Amino acid sequence: VAIMSDMLNEEKIRNLVIKHYNSITCENEMKPEIILGDVPVFSVDTEGSICLDENGDPVLTLDFSKADKIMDFIKKHNEKNPDDTIRVRGHVLVWHSQTPDWFFREKYDSQGAYVGKEKMLKRLENYIQKVLEHYDGVNSPYRGIIYAWDVVNEQIEPDDFHPEKNPGSVRYTCN
């Protein structure tokens, strides 16, 4: 079942999920649009300077709070019910439709030029690594709860033969 973090505010829904499902998917909470946010937030060092990655890009701060609310609920349930656990299908690491436009642009500026293929591939790799580390890294409190990830959502569509129609898309950038 797909659930949203706000749905967990209702006891009836929590009980329904526990009673009838052994697998859930976050509706939107694990999508780049939610984790990255509407505007980029950059990591800063102890002196207040923006941290830069190996490409010279500012290091993004990711917001896992909405998905973590769901993961905390599942983790707590699983700890209390080891013979009746619920697992999570991670959805989704890459999706052109629900990724903020600024993620594809120079300096993460929505007015900047689109980055080239190599830079975009590196950004995607860094983003995916951070998400996977958060949810299944050695020190993650959620390690082992996610059993599968949808890596790329809706990659193939009729407009794939005309990527110039959507120059900001992952498809166009990576061609």
Predicted regions and their residues:
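Substrate-binding cleft and catalytic face of glycoside hydrolase catalytic domains
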Residues: 19-175
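Boundary/entry segment of secreted carbohydrate-active catalytic domains
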Residues: 1-29
